């Protein structure tokens, strides 16, 4: 039983597969059949009728016969073959020869594709032929008009073209021959060839028209404009030399020879080769070279104005610095009698004198070059600018040096004023310690006060010496100032601490009779207090009172601050 069921399942599967493949093949047959009908319905004959108004000779006749043969081949040979193969494919499918059926269908597809390509090619050639005829018919009149206009312009202005007239007229004759050839090809039905001929003449005419338009100007440039510019440049150069400008570095003779050779080259390529682009490029290069020379000449004029205007100013500035050098030198000697100058300060004066000598040499060198005939102003601009910069730098350095000299006296006065203030601070600090009735002054404060007195005295000694060494005096003064300020600050803190300790002990005395431990601690605090050990005294007293009455110390501090 199971065998029978299995067999039935296999048969059903085979039937289903056969049904599926046959259905797929039938669908492809229907598609190819529709394609075949579509090809047969294409309006090829109607499209071919579009050329009936053309002359049926030459290329037109050849194309028409070729198209008709190709269409007849498709209709009478390809399509019947396709029909026959479609029948074979259907028969193979009915007999379950699916592989054979598919091979036939592929062959049919190739035949229909080839037929489609042939039809598209025919339609494209028809369109090209008709379009060529239509465009040529429209454009030939424009070409004739442009030809006539070019011919008239050439004749009317023949004197402007010189030796090129015959060459241009020959080109026009060739274009006219091309127009005649176009007419002959059109008359012979060769519309494609005629189109190519017409386009070629259109390009030739456009090129020739540019020649006719551009050649007169280029010839005028070669024979009149540019030679005039060169002559003007030469005259301007000569005038500048007469005015005293040194222009040998420009090498104008060599440049003029180069310009003349380039001009001959431009005229040659224009007259013999009719190469407008090359001639224009050469003339453009000549113009750029001329402008470049003018820029050099203008630069020389500007350089001359700059050098000649600045040199007198620089000489005056230099002479003034020389005078100031002598004044500063004398001032330095005077200052040295009262003050001891550092090596760096003395070095600044020496450096100033050295740089001034160098500037003097540079100015002399430039003056010598100005007197020479071969040195151009443009070659001196940078040297003059460098001298100007150096003079400004020396002016600034010299002004700073003089300010430093003048500042020495100011520093001395400030130092003496600071000394007076420090002595006053020391006296006030000593009076504070004395009037505060403290048991004694801690050794470190006593040492600071003694050290401050020492540095103050050293500063006084330095200020009284001649020559005065302000650098060393300033160092002692700075040390004295630091020590005095620190001693004053710590003395004030000491007095405040002593008052606080006394208040804390006085507050703690309330509890002495009731608290033996507190009493002993306060005795120790008092002992330390009279031994000048105020820090430990405060710590012991504050700890004892705070233990007996928490918060009492802060309250005492607050009362004192109030």
Swiss-Prot record:
The chain crosses the membrane at residues 3-21. Residues 377-425, 470-497 form a coiled coil. Residues 22-562 are cytoplasmic. Negative regulator of FtsZ ring formation; modulates the frequency and position of FtsZ ring formation. Inhibits FtsZ ring formation at polar sites. Interacts either with FtsZ or with one of its binding partners to promote depolymerization. This is Septation ring formation regulator EzrA. Disruption phenotype: Suppresses temperature-sensitive mutation in FtsZ, in a wild-type FtsZ background increases the number and alters the position of FtsZ rings. In minimal medium cells elongate and occasionally form minicells. Double dynA-ezrA mutants have longer cells with more double septa than either deletion alone. Mutant is hypersensitive to tetracycline. It is found in: Cell membrane; Membrane raft. The gene is ezrA. Belongs to the EzrA family. Keywords: Cell cycle, Cell division, Cell membrane, Coiled coil, Membrane, Septation, Transmembrane, Transmembrane helix. It holds the Pfam family EzrA. InterPro entries: EzrA (IPR010379). It is a single-pass membrane protein. The lineage of its organism: Bacteria, Bacillati, Bacillota, Bacilli, Bacillales. May be degraded by FtsH protease. Residues 1-2 are extracellular. One of its GO terms (biological process) is septin ring assembly. GO terms for cellular component: membrane raft; plasma membrane; septin ring.
